[in-house]
Regions:
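Residue-level signal for the short linker/turn that defines the boundary of a DNA-recognition helix
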Residues: 28, 38-39, 51, 66-69
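Short amphipathic recognition helices of helix-turn-helix/homeodomain-type DNA-binding modules
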Residues: 47, 84-93
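DNA major-groove recognition helix of helix-turn-helix/homeodomain DNA-binding modules
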Residues: 69-84
Length: 93
C-alpha cells in the first residue's frame, strides 16, 4: 500500500458484468455475412494468405475467433463494422 494511504481511503470498485462474445453465433454471423458479400471460404483464405481454409472454417463454426488484425480485415472485406460481426450475450447490467 502506498505511503499515506490507509484502508479507509481505498477506493472500492464495483464489479461490472461485461458482455461476452457468443462464439457459435459470431461464427454463424461470419458465414452469413461472407455469403451476403458473395465471397467463398477460398476467397477469404486467399485474401488472408492462409495455406488452408481451416482458420476460416473454425471462425464460422465458433471453434475460434479471428485475431484483432484479421477481424479488422474481415470487416473491411465484408463492408461492415466489427460490431456487425461480433455477437455478444448482451448481459451488461
Amino acid at each position: 500500500m502506498p505511503k499515506g494511504v490507509n484502508n479507509s481511503e481505498k477506493e472500492v470498485f464495483e464489479v461490472i458484468d461485461f458482455p461476452t462474445i457468443d462464439l457459435a453465433m459470431t461464427g454463424a454471423n461470419i458465414a452469413r455475412l461472407r455469403k451476403a458479400a458473395g465471397l467463398s471460404v477460398k476467397d477469404l483464405q486467399a485474401a488472408f494468405g492462409f495455406n488452408s481454409p481451416q482458420a476460416i472454417y473454425k471462425w464460422q463454426t465458433g471453434a475460434a475467433l479471428p485475431t484483432v488484425d484479421n477481424l479488422i480485415g474481415l470487416a473491411a472485406m465484408l463492408h461492415v463494422q466489427i460490431d456487425d460481426i461480433l455477437v455478444t450475450d448482451n448481459t451488461v447490467a
